[in-house]
């Protein structure tokens, strides 16, 4: 059982593992009794409440970062090709990690504690890709991996459209790495500009000069807010990225504690039609745009 909003990689691996053993699987039904129930939770109570319904089972196994950072899949499950039929509406897309870990150790991020402060290769593409047309790569910092060239080569040779979902580290960009990235069929590149004290403009400009991905819609940058930044610093990063040909996307840390202006900023930036139609945040009137939208219905 999970939230179903995004394919759960661990559950897909568990499904494949149990099916290979001849076990019968289904999504949880509160009216039934089971030998075993797996519960997966990505977020803590700040973002999602735990399941409070009745579970009839001989054994319940809870996993995911929402339950803690120390739970791990057994090795024989971790390296099982996911059962993509578990989520029929997402079939045709492969999900997985080629590397784990990140050397940055950012205070807002759990990756360093959970996966380690070194990026290491953990799988080849063939472990979770079987010819799907699209690959969603979940690596936290692929470019920090010593095996980056070999792993990017595998992505390029696949011929699949690749979405680098978790943010390539723009500070680690080199001509050699961009040359290899240019060989990958790219659906979406994601970067991040989390710390307003870090001036990353030079890195982003350098990448723009080297990359063959010129469409700003494929060059998304996560902008962290509500974490040691002022509203003015948030706006600076957003305007600067847009001016350089990138597509900013506001992430709000501990959203329940965020001030109204930060929530308004997220609404403006992440609605891409609004963000391109209203060029200045000070001109964004949520009530006015909501009224216009209702009048068009």
What are the language-model segments listed below?
Residues 183, 188-190, 197-297:
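A structural motif corresponding to the C-terminal lobe/cap of the Radical SAM core domain
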């Amino acid at each position: 059982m999970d939230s179903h909003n995004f394919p759960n990689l661990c559950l897909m691996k568990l499904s494949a593992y149990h099916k290979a053993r001849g076990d019968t699987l289904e999504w949880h039904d509160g009216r039934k009794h089971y030998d075993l129930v797996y519960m997966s939770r990505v977020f803590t109570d700040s973002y999602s409440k735990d399941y409070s319904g009745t579970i009839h089972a001989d054994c319940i196994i809870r996993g995911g970062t929402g339950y803690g950072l120390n739970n791990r899949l057994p090795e024989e499950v971790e390296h099982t090709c996911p059962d993509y039929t578990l989520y029929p509406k997402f079939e045709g897309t492969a999900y997985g990690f080629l590397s784990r870990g990140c050397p940055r150790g950012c205070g807002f991020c759990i990756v360093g504690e959970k996966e380690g402060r070194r990026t290491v290769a953990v799988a080849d593409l063939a472990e979770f890709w079987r010819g799907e047309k699209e690959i969603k790569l979940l690596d936290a910092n692929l470019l920090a991996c010593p095996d980056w060239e070999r792993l990017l080569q595998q992505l390029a040779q696949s011929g699949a459209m690749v979405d680098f979902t978790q943010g390539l580290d723009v500070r680690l960009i080199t001509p050699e790495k961009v040359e290899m990235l240019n060989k990958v069929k790219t659906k979406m590149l994601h970067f991040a500009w989390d710390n307003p004290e870090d001036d990353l403009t030079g890195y982003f400009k350098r990448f723009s000069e080297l990359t063959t991905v010129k469409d700003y819609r494929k060059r998304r940058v996560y902008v962290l807010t509500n974490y040691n930044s002022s509203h003015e610093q948030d706006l600076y990063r957003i305007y600067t990225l847009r001016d350089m040909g990138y597509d900013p996307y506001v992430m709000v840390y501990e959203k329940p504690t965020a001030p109204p202006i930060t929530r308004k900023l997220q609404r403006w930036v992440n609605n891409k039609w609004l963000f391109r139609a209203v060029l200045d945040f000070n001109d964004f009137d949520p009530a006015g745009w909501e009224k216009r939208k209702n009048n068009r219905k």
